[in-house]
Amino acid sequence: MNPVIKKFQFGQSTVTLETGRIARQASGAVLVTVDDDVSVLVTVVGAKTADPSKGFFPLSVHYQEKTYAAGKIPGGFFKREARPSEKETLTSRLIDRPIRPLFPEGFQNEVQVICTVVSTSKKTDPDIAAMIGTSAALAVSGIPFDGPIGAARVAFHPETGYLLNPNYEQLKASSLDMVVAGTKDAVLMVESEAKELTEDQMLGAVLFAHDEFQAVIKAVEELAAEAGKPRWDWTAPQANTALLDAIRSEFGAAISEAYTITIKQQRYARLDELREQVVAKFSGEEGQPSGGEVKDAFGEIEYRTVRENIVNGKPRIDGRDTRTVRPLAIEVGVLDKTHGSALFTRGETQALVVATLGTARDAQLLDTLEGEKKDAFMLHYNFPPYSVGECGRMGATGRREIGHGRLARRGVAAMLPSADEFPYTIRVVSEITESNGSSSMASVCGASLALMDAGVPMKAPVAGIAMGLVKEGEKFAVLTDILGDEDHLGDMDFKVAGTAKGVTALQMDIKIQGITEEIMEIALGQALEARLNILGQMSQVIAQSRSELSANAPTMLAMKIDQDKIRDVIGKGGATIRAICEETKASIDIEDDGSIKIFGETKEAAEAAKQRVLSITAEAEIGKIYVGKVERIVDFGAFVNILPGKDGLVHISQISDQRIEKVTDVLKEGQEVKVLVLDVDNRGRIKLSIKDVAAAEASGV
């Protein structure tokens, strides 16, 4: 196959799609190059047959950043890339989410997508290039796929408006970082963080991106027309309508009644009981469907029952209408020895959230393609199996936990104080202790509460809510505060976090095409109503950050010294600063501009370390009295140490009002004496007096 190259203009950039030169044994492979900035190789492989034992669609997406792409060699002992970083995991999820709903229903052949960053100038994020490459590789592969998709990043500035595909530098000045993906006619995925933008501004960004990435879809279609492989001869399995009708006829009413049980565990127990009855009745004998087929049919009846009830205006599973938030229970300060804590309960979803403050040295060191950087804010989300009443695997953090933690982090990050205002490292951990829908948004609420409880000066409290959608034909219902079942059986998962003033995070995943601007507008409006309700209830428990940090938190003292004094504080080989830290049990961070941050487990420890630094960096003040130690005696006087590293001369004439023949008649080495600073010349030499101390003290010096 001869290489096929397609170039197109995407905003300010020229994008090149190339297929047929690299990775030719993959089902589809495309090398995406954006200007001379970034290149990503995307491969897609699809298995020709399905594994019937799996019973689901085994799609896997792997995004990987190779250090050679940025001209670097990996660190560590093995000098090769190890397990995926958090950035790689999040980007893998970002690519997976818009493509998964576009594979046909019933398609269960394994599909693997691998996106490899092979070259980067480190100026822009390669994720959009990887998403474009995924769309193109699927389009040329012949695998059944209802694409192509387009993708774009959007920034926003109040004065200049929306900006397409900003680089890292432009994002720093932006109030918005949003990634949008979708097809020619529909938006399928949104991932964003913002600085309190309005709902209209957020919706405008989504629509702006959808208009702009039409250029991507057009180019991919042209590439597929020229270089695409024949589409697979695959047909969807026929639905067993007779089985569906039989189950609905005999068990439909019981299933519908089960979905009126408001307590999750009781509802699941009743549905399990009905499922067993259905499997026993309709499978097992010769000529009857398999147990798995009957279970799938039962699930289809569940799906249709819940959806029909909702769009026809009946109460939801737990009896609520479409706009009501579940009952809230909010507590702060629930753990005595932590720095800040909160227990946030919304219905059957509960998060125990803990905030911990640390020193600058506790910041996370990130080794990225762009270079090393420090992250002084971490939010970790844990989802133990007991939260849904199950036994399960315990071990490494999963992709879902990383993704939910990042979403919760996006929700609160914009409301944190700057490093200058609050130079602590902050770690928030959300332990999901119960789950029945929207645990990530419970984590946002809990994180805001725990941070305020810890005394972190938040700009404003933050709350989050998850919205859902059920759409049948022209009928639709937007649901506020969805349950787990409504998430699973619905057409949209729409999470919004923000303050009373505006949106700080928006995540949207849509499983169907045909979500209109009107529906998104209604969802954002209902989410605002729910968010304000939750913020109101949170403010009744804690309305603003505590005025003082927790007594358990480390004490931080800030000071600044002359830059030429930095080496005195550090000492030869770090000996001086190490000694201060060991003796006071405090930690000291010194910046190149002379800024010093001192952290102590107690206020006393931090203060002791500060006094040690002050004593090292202090200058002798003319007219001030010091208690010093005689270091050396000479014929014409004595040298007295008044500050660390600073000796002054007491001339023999300044020792006493009486005439002195020999200095040693009055002073001895090691003796402590009070001295008055008479002068400091331009070479830093200090003149001292002992005889004038009494007069100076009498005058109140």
Curated annotation (Swiss-Prot):
Cofactor: Mg(2+)
The keyword Nucleotidyltransferase is annotated on this UniProt entry: yes
Positions of the KH domain: 554-613
Principal EC category: transferase
Major subcellular site: cytoplasm
Residues annotated as binding Mg(2+): D487, D493
The entry's keywords: Cytoplasm, Magnesium, Metal-binding, Nucleotidyltransferase, RNA-binding, Transferase
InterPro entries membership: ExoRNase_PH_dom1, ExoRNase_PH_dom2, ExoRNase_PH_dom2_sf, KH_dom, KH_dom_type_1, KH_dom_type_1_sf, NA-bd_OB-fold, PNPase
Any one GO CC term of the record: cytosol
Subcellular location field: Cytoplasm
Domain S1 motif: 623-691
Gene Ontology MF annotations: 3'-5'-RNA exonuclease activity; magnesium ion binding; polyribonucleotide nucleotidyltransferase activity; RNA binding
One GO BP: mRNA catabolic process
Enzyme Commission code(s) on record: 2.7.7.8
Subunit text: Component of the RNA degradosome, which is a multiprotein complex involved in RNA processing and mRNA degradation.
Family stated for the protein in its record: Belongs to the polyribonucleotide nucleotidyltransferase family.
Functional description taken from the UniProt entry: Involved in mRNA degradation. Catalyzes the phosphorolysis of single-stranded polyribonucleotides processively in the 3'- to 5'-direction.
Name this polypeptide is given: Polyribonucleotide nucleotidyltransferase
Species for this entry: Stutzerimonas stutzeri (strain A1501)
